[in-house]
Amino acid sequence: MLKFAIAVALLLFIGLELREARDGYPQSKVNYCKIYCPNTTVCQWTCKNRAGATDGDCRWSSCYCFNVAPDTVLYGDPGTKPCMA
């Protein structure tokens, strides 16, 4: 039981802190959207509504945003995974 408690505490300490994207959906502080990217249309909608970007592309089931709005603060560079605003 003690090992389980330590493991949970460690996971919480490492990075399960949640923030919110523009649409209020929780996001991880490690910059990954909590969505699966089935196609480019879904990715482009996600980029527009979460990162303020005008374009997006699915790559290896992950959504990447491009042309991010200049006033959007990102934890990475344009062309990285969305939900970083």
Swiss-Prot record:
Entry GO CC: extracellular region
LCN-type CS-alpha/beta domain span: 22-84
Tissue-level expression: Expressed by the venom gland.
Superkingdom in the source lineage: Eukaryota
Gene3D superfamilies registered for this protein in UniProt: Knottin, scorpion toxin-like
Predominant place of localization: secreted
Transmembrane segment boundaries: none
Keywords, comma-separated and alphabetical: Disulfide bond, Ion channel impairing toxin, Neurotoxin, Secreted, Signal, Toxin, Voltage-gated sodium channel impairing toxin
Disulphide bridges, residue numbers: C33-C83, C37-C58, C43-C63, C47-C65
Domain notes: Has the structural arrangement of an alpha-helix connected to antiparallel beta-sheets by disulfide bonds (CS-alpha/beta).
Family stated for the protein in its record: Belongs to the long (4 C-C) scorpion toxin superfamily. Sodium channel inhibitor family. Beta subfamily.
Name of this protein: Toxin TdNa9
